[in-house]
A protein has these predicted regions:
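Conserved catalytic/acceptor-binding region of the Class I
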Residues: 142-206, 210-230
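Class I SAM-dependent methyltransferase SAM/SAH-binding core
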Residues: 47-104
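A short glycine-rich, Lys/Arg-flanked "PGG" loop and its adjoining helix->strand segment in the class I
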Residues: 127-139
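A short SAM/SAH-binding and catalytic strip from SAM-dependent methyltransferases
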Residues: 112-125
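Conserved alpha-helix/loop element of class I SAM-dependent methyltransferases that forms part
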Residues: 26-45, 61
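A short acidic, Gly/Pro-enriched loop at the edge of an enzyme's catalytic core
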Residues: 102-113
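Class I SAM-dependent methyltransferase Rossmann-like catalytic core
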Residues: 2-32
């Protein structure tokens, strides 16, 4: 496993904030599927956290669905939340808090629903993150999240493996590892399933550039420093 540099994660997404909404098609699809999971549930939450809220689209929809709830958008990158503030409007505002998913500035048992779309894969210690969620959740509350899985970006990973041994992507977890982390953290009755979302790009280099523009670039703490040369890029695409 390649350790994750959380400071690098915050920097990458902060730089991507202004253009994030133009490029985040996969994130939108995953968010809509996650929101659909809420539809059949008869929830009446008083406080909702959107962890890894980005530019706030999930928080806005949660506020629309639960207008009486306090919705708190949490993200590690301040520029993302600044974009959320510009876009949220005045009619159904939500709070914005810069915080780590594994160190929430909230009291114990103070949250009814945690919503988190494609965030937990950026957490260095998933068990610690889930334990923190369990701390702030009230008894019987719900955490609903999505994550990239073990098979995500495998073709790009294989392309880089032909170039060198340095980590160019963070390692994603198998669904069983995610479930085990939830159980070990003390979360009750975890239910996980797997969906396949496909995104086609002309070549590996195009995909790599899109990931970087999204803020989803290399955040492995053991990544190679410095620029990638033209020869390495050509070999990666071969």
């Amino acid at each position: 496993m390649s350790p994750i540099d959380r400071r690098r994660v915050a920097q990458n997404f902060g730089r991507a904030a202004a253009r994030y909404d133009q490029l985040s098609q996969l994130q939108r699809e995953a968010r809509e599927e996650l929101l659909d999971r809420l539809t059949p549930l008869q929830l009446k939450p008083d406080r909702i956290l959107d962890i890894g809220a980005g530019t706030g689209h999930g928080a806005r929809e949660l506020k629309r669905r639960f207008p009486r709830a306090e919705v708190v958008a949490i993200d590690l990158a301040l520029p993302m939340l600044e974009q959320a503030r510009r876009q949220q409007g005045w009619f159904r505002p939500f709070r914005r808090v810069v915080a780590d998913a594994a160190a929430l500035p909230l009291a114990d048992a103070s949250v009814d629903l945690i919503f988190s779309n494609l965030c937990v894969q950026w957490c260095p210690d998933l068990r610690q993150t889930f334990a923190e969620w369990g701390r702030v959740l009230r008894p019987g509350a719900l955490a609903l999240f999505s994550s990239f899985g073990l098979d995500s970006l495998q073709q790009l990973r294989q392309s880089w493996a032909a170039v060198d041994a340095h980590p160019h992507l963070i390692d994603f977890l198998h669904i069983q590892q995610i479930g085990d982390a939830a159980l070990k953290a003390g979360l009750s009755n975890p239910v996980l399933d797997r969906d396949l979302l496909q995104r086609r790009t002309p070549d590996a280099l195009t995909l790599m550039r899109e990931l970087k523009q999204l803020g989803a670039g290399n955040a492995a703490s053991e990544r190679a420093r410095g620029l990638t040369g033209k020869r390495a890029l050509a070999k990666m695409q071969a």
